[in-house]
């Protein structure tokens, strides 16, 4: 399954707020946003599916990519759900988004694909690059205007504790692996792991 490129408001109307997908916030209308129809029984499969979709759309992943991350998390020591979330949070495109250099993760991915981003003074054009503690993220000097425009037009997010951002020098630092408590996406990773339990 390819990466979703359709209307983003359609997704958040169904699944609820996904800050990585879009900065738009929908007001609760006569219908519902991210909620099941009242008095309608929802199957466990659908609940797991929706949690999986939240994760996939928020981080902008294909089905194959998300399955790969689940397999990696299952092989690692510790809580599979927590490791899954931490691994996704340490992707380069997500780090750029969390630093406030782009209003969305798709926008951050575009910055990386266009070779605007450097890690430890080396150009990196792989959005899925796994950032590690002590990594320093900077912007190609010729493209600082793009970052300035992004920062002026987007909401000013609070930079999480595992990151540091110098808005004067456009320089971000990874201090440590993110703690699960600092991930602002409301999701039950265990349900995602259960959804894929027969495929891994």
From Swiss-Prot:
Domain S4 RNA-binding: 90-150
Quaternary context: Part of the 30S ribosomal subunit. Contacts protein S5. The interaction surface between S4 and S5 is involved in control of translational fidelity.
Similarity comment: family membership: Belongs to the universal ribosomal protein uS4 family.
UniProt-listed InterPro entries: Ribosomal_uS4, Ribosomal_uS4_bac-type, Ribosomal_uS4_CS, Ribosomal_uS4_N, S4_RNA-bd, S4_RNA-bd_sf
Record-level GO cellular component terms: chloroplast; small ribosomal subunit
Record-given protein name: Small ribosomal subunit protein uS4c
UniProt keywords, alphabetically: Chloroplast, Plastid, Ribonucleoprotein, Ribosomal protein, RNA-binding, rRNA-binding
Protein species of origin: Pellia neesiana
One GO term (biological process): translation
Localisation: Plastid, Chloroplast
An example Gene Ontology molecular-function term: structural constituent of ribosome
Species classification: Eukaryota, Viridiplantae, Streptophyta, Embryophyta, Marchantiophyta
SUPFAM superfamilies reported for this sequence: Alpha-L RNA-binding motif (SSF55174)
One Pfam family matching this protein: S4
Role: One of the primary rRNA binding proteins, it binds directly to 16S rRNA where it nucleates assembly of the body of the 30S subunit. With S5 and S12 plays an important role in translational accuracy.
